[in-house]
Amino acid sequence: LPADERIQRLRADRWIGYPRAVEALNRLETLYAWPNKQRMPNLLLVGPTNNGKSMIIEKFRRTHPASSDADQEHMPVLVVQMPSEPSVIRFYVALLAAMGAPLRPRPRLPEMEQLALALLRKVGVRMLVIDELHNVLAGNSVNRREFLNLLRFLGNELRIPLVGVGTRDAYLAIRSDDQLENRFEPMMLPVWEANDDCCS
């Protein structure tokens, strides 16, 4: 291969299926196939920065890609990034943007909430993944409480698994709410080490 092509290949993302990553994918598949019920199980994927959490989510999302037929979009796995501060309105904006929904200027929260719920159902979202969930701790206590209440509301209303992804701060945020702590099963991703698990 020419040098520039080799360089491009070296810079590209690479999936490394070390055992804990494969275990995380299997856990996501189990949740994805979970039958609809009143209280769905959720997952909290926790690990240090630059440890492959988002790559695991991207690999899973590609396994269940969005599609469209006629005038209908299908988005079985929706991945949304938590805004830099835990504002309910900003989260709904991010959620609607991830679904490609047009937003009118200065929408009111009740309208955004109803639109988001309607679209999540319409496009057939079966799992909602919230990346960078540790950003919940960036806000004040009132904003944090409102956002954690929103997570509970979405879980109850949609009856789909929620997956939080983030650093240890995400775990601390979820633990600050007794109900959410019972609903989110933490799965820790260890720090990368040069051992047999990571060698091919």
Task: Give the role of each language-model region.
Residues 1-41:
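A short, basic N-terminal segment
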Residues 37-59:
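Walker A/P-loop nucleotide-binding motif
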Residues 175-191:
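A short helix-turn-beta junction within AAA+ P-loop NTPase domains corresponding to the substrate/partner-engaging
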Residues 132, 164-170:
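A short beta-strand-to-loop transition that corresponds to the Sensor-1 phosphate-sensing loop
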